[in-house]
């Protein structure tokens, strides 16, 4: 088990990291998309050097890489650890003011002095956290446990390995920018991250082990109208807003995020913006199955063609579809040791592994597309991307324990 001193160190690290404003910016054309990410990258570079890691570098894109050689000649594997610097653009990450609740007693938790609260009535998992130390928000921002809990856990595990001289394999570490907007990983220096397999430390509840994720794409549908003074609009105005609303009705009403779970895919209208003359709809397309994923993209294309044929518009609606990431399972299944090692590590520290698909994506999906198996490990956090985000300190301890156990590389 981790000592009390290390528990305090873990909490201190986490609280320090969330003080950095690293919210990524949607539609950014360069990485990092925010200055705070580079500031955190430089801080982590300094700490990694202090911990004795080698080849510690920060690229101009704010990708941090480092290496810790094995201290046992019998441990020849190289394992990678990955976490991301940025926080979600879906909720403010500026001026995060965490609140620490010692020995949560159950019931509602008031957040700050406003009207926000979190309740086991809405979040049943809170019943499992009674007696634990919880870190919550003040109700005005997200917390940043996604993914600064993962960063703190990796750094604390490295610190313990070094202080206690625990036998370990070769370790590569990477901290990446702009994971939340799918941008930073495209600047990832694979040549500096040569390893047998890796893990993103970017999951949620204790025990989660994830190695399947959505295939993902984004579709943008643009509508063009014609504006005329409303008093004289009859037979002349063409309202792009009305066209967009009509088009939205063609989608299956039950194939949306709020009505699907498990391995069910969906269409998600993420953004509706514009005016009478021009509107853009942004859809997220998600599915675990590659064939179903292709069919979903074809469905939107066909609906656009039908809509244009039906309306006979002078300027037809336009469609742009861009793939975001692929299901990592096709790569991970060929490296079963990556799953077996995580399984054994969890069981060794008394945690029951919970294999589940990721209804989202991680940097591991991109790394898998480059041939590197990269399952995802829990962080102990919940309610990511929201003011109700929280993390359990005991859950974070569990993650550190699992990381250390994995890096011992027993029976490999």
From Swiss-Prot:
Q: Where is the active site?
A: 86, 179 (proton acceptor)
One GO BP on record is:
peptide catabolic process
Q: Which InterPro entries match?
A: ArgE/DapE_CS, Bact_exopeptidase_dim_dom, Peptidase_M20, Peptidase_M20_dimer, Peptidase_M20B
According to its UniProt record, this protein's enzyme class is: hydrolase
Q: Which PROSITE patterns match?
A: ARGE_DAPE_CPG2_1 (PS00758), ARGE_DAPE_CPG2_2 (PS00759)
Report the principal subcellular site: cytoplasm
EC annotation? 3.4.11.4
Q: How is the cofactor bound?
A: Binds 2 Zn(2+) ions per subunit.
Query: Which superkingdom does the taxonomy of this entry point to?
Result: Bacteria
Pfam families, alphabetically?
M20_dimer, Peptidase_M20
Residues binding Zn(2+) 2: 146, 180, 385
- Protein residues bound to Zn(2+) 1: 84, 146, 202
Gene Ontology terms, cellular component aspect? cytosol
Q: Name one GO molecular function term.
A: metallopeptidase activity
| Homology family | Belongs to the peptidase M20B family.
Q: Tell me, what does this protein do in biology?
A: Cleaves the N-terminal amino acid of tripeptides.
What's the protein here called?
Peptidase T
Species per Swiss-Prot/TrEMBL record: Haemophilus influenzae (strain 86-028NP)
């Amino acid at each position: 088990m981790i000592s009390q001193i290390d528990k305090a160190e873990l909490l201190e690290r986490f609280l320090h990291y969330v003080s950095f404003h690293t919210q990524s910016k949607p539609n950014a054309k360069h990485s990092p998309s925010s200055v705070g990410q580079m500031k955190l990258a430089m801080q982590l570079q300094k700490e990694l050097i202090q911990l004795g890691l080698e080849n510690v570098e920060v690229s101009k894109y704010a990708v941090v890489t480092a290496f810790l050689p094995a201290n046992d000649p019998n441990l020849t594997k190289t394992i990678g650890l990955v976490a991301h610097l940025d926080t979600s653009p879906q909720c403010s990450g500026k001026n995060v003011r965490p609140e620490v609740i010692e020995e949560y007693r159950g019931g509602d938790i008031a957040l700050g002095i406003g009207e926000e609260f979190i309740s086991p009535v809405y979040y049943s998992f809170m019943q499992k956290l009674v007696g634990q130390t919880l870190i919550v928000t003040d109700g005005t921002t997200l917390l940043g446990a996604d993914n600064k809990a993962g960063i703190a856990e990796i750094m604390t595990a490295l610190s313990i390995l070094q202080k206690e001289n625990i036998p370990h394999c070769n370790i590569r570490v990477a901290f990446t920018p702009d994971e939340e907007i799918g941008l930073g990983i495209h600047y990832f220096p694979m040549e500096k991250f040569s390893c047998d397999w890796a893990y993103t430390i970017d999951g949620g509840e204790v025990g989660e082990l994830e190695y399947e994720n959505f295939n993902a794409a984004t579709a943008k549908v643009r509508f063009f109208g014609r504006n005329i003074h409303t008093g004289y609009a009859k037979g002349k105005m063409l309202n792009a807003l009305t066209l967009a609303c009509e088009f939205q009705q063609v989608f299956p009403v039950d194939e949306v995020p709020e009505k699907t779970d498990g391995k069910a895919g969906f269409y998600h209208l993420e953004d509706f913006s514009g005016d009478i003359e021009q509107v853009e709809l942004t859809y997220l397309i998600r599915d675990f199955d590659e064939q179903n994923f292709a069919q979903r993209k074809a469905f939107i294309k066909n609906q656009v063609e039908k809509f244009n044929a039906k309306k006979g518009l002078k300027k037809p609606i336009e469609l742009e579809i861009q793939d975001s990431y692929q299901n990592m399972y096709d790569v991970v299944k060929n490296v079963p040791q990556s799953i077996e090692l995580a399984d054994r590590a969890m069981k060794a520290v008394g945690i029951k592994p919970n294999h589940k698909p990721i209804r989202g994506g991680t940097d591991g999906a991109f790394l898998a597309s480059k041939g590197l198996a990269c399952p995802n490990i829990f962080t102990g956090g919940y309610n990511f991307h929201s003011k109700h985000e929280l993390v359990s300190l005991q859950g974070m301890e569990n993650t550190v324990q699992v990381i250390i156990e994995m890096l011992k590389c027993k029976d490999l």
